[in-house]
Amino acid sequence: MKLNNIELTFEDFAREMAKLKNEKHFDYLVTIIGEDFGEEGLGCIYILENTENNERCSVRTIAKKVDGSDVIPTVINLWKSADLLEREVFDFVGIKFLGHPDMRRLFLRTDFKGHPLRKDFDMSPEANKFPLTDEPESDYTVEYNLDADGHLTETKHRLFTDDDYVVNIGPNHPSTHGVLRLQTVINGETVKRIYPHLGYIHRGIEKMWEGMTYPQTLALTDRLNYLSAMMHRHALVGVIEEAMGIELSDRIRYIRTIMDELQRIDSHLLFLGCTAQDLGALTAFLYCMRDREHVLNVMEETTGGRLIMNYYRIGGLQADIDPNFVENTKKLCKYLRPKIQEYLDVFGDNVITHNRLVGVGPMDKENCINYGVTGPAGRAAGWKNDTRK
């Protein structure tokens, strides 16, 4: 997909971004990429999408130097998904977003020194020694703005009021299915606010890639989400192939697509099974694990792996499909189709499932787009965001 590339100055940035959102209906902020552009300075690339016609554009702007800091106006008032995206850029690149109410680090510790995706970042072990103490924690957020004279000001906001009831979930908790900490403000059964603490398993993959060749980076994509290893590697080899002008045969395209879909089924079965287990439906969990084994068997015959496959290569595949792959994939589809009704019988249509899930945390289409909630949740709200169509 070729993007319409737009360059904006610091002075025009806030006004023109509002026009893109309100007048040209670029209502979905796909991502924000913080970048060190060398002599140009630090800056960001914003990928925007018009959800009515799926048109995309990229907006590039260079941060302004103010009192020794690099600053860009926040877009959180236009797209709510900018909240965590801007905090990520601040954490790794060091750009301060003016008007953002919570400019704290998101992934790295609060006492981490420097911003690792800058080209001048000190990589020596002495700069950031392995910490032997708990992470310092503040009860305040930080907001940056410019005063009437153009100088940078800092305002602190309290995270919690005296009346807030705060429940700390994680970083190790059976309900999170991963290392994640959530400071949760609740009122009875209603969650009023969540402050996420991420990065407990952050491995610095993007920084590692700066010193690698393209083929060396492939294995790391599989580990971004090992339940979507095929798709993540597919995304990386795809952009490399496009940049190099490599044309793929239809056979390779079909094989990659089928492998992606098989792993998507594998991932969904694990999700459904774990959700059922969390609600106490152990039978549904075992059914999902039983059927997931059949999917993994088909992929293993060709790739040799059941979790991390290492199958896609730049320009092609590790090897051709197993002679039995086509027949076994057809058998798998025939086997799985009637199982959908079985999942509904034992779990989906169960009154306990409905009581626990229906009406809990609903989001309409507008909010899904505003917060960047894609996938099944976004589609369920009426947002047609499936890129396969």
PLM regions with names:
Residues 1-190, 267, 352-359:
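Terminal low-complexity/charged segments
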Residues 110, 148-177, 185-389:
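Active-site bordering "gate/hinge" segments
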